[in-house]
Amino acid sequence: MDSKMILYRGSLKSCNYSCSYCPFAKHPSSAREMEKDRMDWMKFCKSLEERAEDLGRFALMVVPYGEALIHPWYWEGLAFLSRLKQAEAVGVQTNFSFSAGQSGKLWREAKGRKEKLRLWATYHPEMVSPARFAKECREAAEEGIALCAGAVGVPENLSLIGELRRCLPDEIYLWINAMDGLKRAYTREEVQAFSAIDPFFIRELSAVPANFKNCRNRLFVEGNGKMQTCNISGRMPGNWYQEDFSFPSAVCRQKACSCYLAYGGRGDWVNTLLFGKYPLFRIPRYFPAVFLDIDGTLLQEGEREIDPLTAASLKVLKKMGTRLFFATSLPVPEAKKRCANVWELFDGGIFAVGAHLLWKEAGQKHGQMPRNKIRQKEALHQEYQEILYPLDEAVLSAVKARYKSLHCRLYAYRNKGKLYKITLCRREGCGWERAEERFLQDVLPETRKGSVRFLREENCMQVIPAGASKENGVKI
């Protein structure tokens, strides 16, 4: 069962801050309004407990208009939910103005699971100094609480936000949201300055076309039970509290995902790679190296080149020191053609399902290559190293003798004259059966049957050396 990401926003509209740009600044709420918010929240928490078994694994984040964590019932509810075995993470957006001592006591008394708590801490320069805010973040991190910090990218606040970055530990990510209502584009200097603070800021500047197909298993629930796919998608039929509730399919009426709560919650591989299983918590992951497929990952069906947002994300990973490698069934020339706009960001890769390995040396010690594998290693040119697993010409001759009866086209791939892959390709939508794979195995010479591997990929049958695979390529 797929994991679910649920956002909750109750009726709370009051805040203890008075930021000049915020409509909820010092918004007064009556005792009756506060009690309604409390009752709605506790009702929602109880309903999550009752539905947890049906929902399966999930994460919950509170995204209030006002400040939630100055009210004890939010701490109590989050702690309650954190004890559910199906709840993998619980979090909230906050200005970090709550009392750490009092809140920690509430959490402990409610037996909350601290390792599941996630905080999205927003810095408001008008209300708190960078040093004070950084101190609160640092102390929370030292308590073992996972968090991110961030601010709205107001150009006039650049120096203060830069100071906050210097005050924060390196391991706490400081994000920058593009400013709504700026009424002009950011200057080149401003983009560079904000990107130096938040390497992912470039993602805020690219419009992401809406696509509800990327928004499965996410839901935005209001205090009265009304639902949306995300905070901007528009209302969907039904209500969270209806008796015949089932997790709804995504509905979207927008043309673009215009904020992080919208584009950050999509099921895109980029979001998961950068920010983990539940990217809406905005806590980055860091890798020394990543291996990425081309078809279905870097390029979706129908795409002719890698989209600007994906390209920008890859540039950020490269800048942060992550080594990028391809892991694809495509041969090198085809991969280079299809990924021309990002090719230089990659340090090589695993091509032709592992039959052709190519990489730039980076001074690190590579794993020991298997001694019992047929291989050829040589410099492709000065900056690359290469391993090629050759395929015997007798295999090609045997396949050529029979392939026409399978109603397909045959492509043989060579590097410097050496055969390393055969692809049998049918028209789109026509797959391959296991019996056809056995038929091809039977036509091989007896002395070559153990040296070949067949791999069915949609409308293609790949014929490669037995020692070649993406998994082995990663190990090498």
Predicted regions located by residue number:
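Core AdoMet radical
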Residues: 6, 26-39, 55-71, 81-101, ...
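Canonical Radical SAM [4Fe-4S] cluster-binding loop centered on the CxxxCxxC motif
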Residues: 2-43, 231
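Conserved C-terminal portion of the radical SAM core fold
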Residues: 60, 128-207
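Active-site phosphate-binding/coordination module
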Residues: 106-107, 304-414
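Accessory C-terminal segments flanking Radical SAM cores
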Residues: 184-283
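Asp-based phosphoryl-transfer active-site loop
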Residues: 286-303
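Substrate-recognition element of Asp-dependent hydrolases with the DxDx(T/V) motif
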Residues: 94-96, 149, 314-338, 412-429, ...
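Conserved acidic, metal-coordinating active-site core of Asp-based
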Residues: 394-476
